[in-house]
C-alpha cells in the first residue's frame, strides 16, 4: 500500500531501476518523477500522512545537445555521397547549420520568403511554431544550396519533398559515412549555428 512508501523504499527503487533494469540516469529520473506525481497527489488528498519524496532528490543529468564542429561540418560539406538522397539531406542539414532554421521552417520555405535588400538576399518570414517574424541574411553557402535545387522547385517550395521522418535514419547513415561518431539529429544543425555565427 501507499503507507509502505518510505524515503528508503524510494532510494531502493532508484537503485533497482539502475542495477536490475539497467536504466540510465535520465530514465530513472523519469520513472521516479512519475511515481512522485502519484505520491504527491495522494499526500495532497490526505491518503498518506507524509510525502516520502520530500527528502529525495535525483538529477536528470541531461547531456548537452551534440553539434558538429566547424571541421566536422566541412568534412560533411566536402564528402562525396554515392546516394543522391544523402547528398540532399546533407544540403538541408548544412542549410540549417548556416541559417538556424528549424526543419519545419525549411520545409515551408518558399521563394516568396527570399527577398533582396540592398543587393543582399534575405529570408524574411515567420517561425512556424511561434508565428514570430524573423529575418536571416543568406550567406554564400546557403545561396549555393538554394540555387542547386532551383530546377526541382515546385509550387514555390524552395526544398521540395521534405519529410522529417524519412530523413532521420539516412541522416545517421550520412553522419557515420563521414566518419563522425557523434549522435546527431537534425535539430543539432541549429546548435552548430552558434559555432559558425
Please describe what each predicted stretch is.
Residues 105-108, 183-185, 194:
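Active-site-proximal segment of tyrosine recombinases
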Residues 139-181:
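Active-site/catalytic core of tyrosine-dependent DNA strand-transfer enzymes
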Residues 17, 95-96, 196-197:
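Short alpha-helical segment immediately N-terminal to, or the first helix within
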Residues 120-126, 158, 185, 196-197:
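Short functional hotspots where side chains directly engage DNA or cofactors
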Residues 23-33, 44-103, 152:
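Basic, Lys/Arg- and aromatic-enriched nucleic-acid-binding interface segment
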Residues 1-40, 45, 84-85, 162-165, ...:
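N-terminal core-binding DNA-recognition domain of tyrosine site-specific recombinases/integrases
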Residues 57, 63-66, 72, 99, ...:
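Conserved tyrosine-mediated DNA breakage-rejoining catalytic core shared by Y-recombinases
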Residues 7, 31, 73, 88-90, ...:
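Short, leucine-enriched amphipathic alpha-helices that occur as contiguous helical runs
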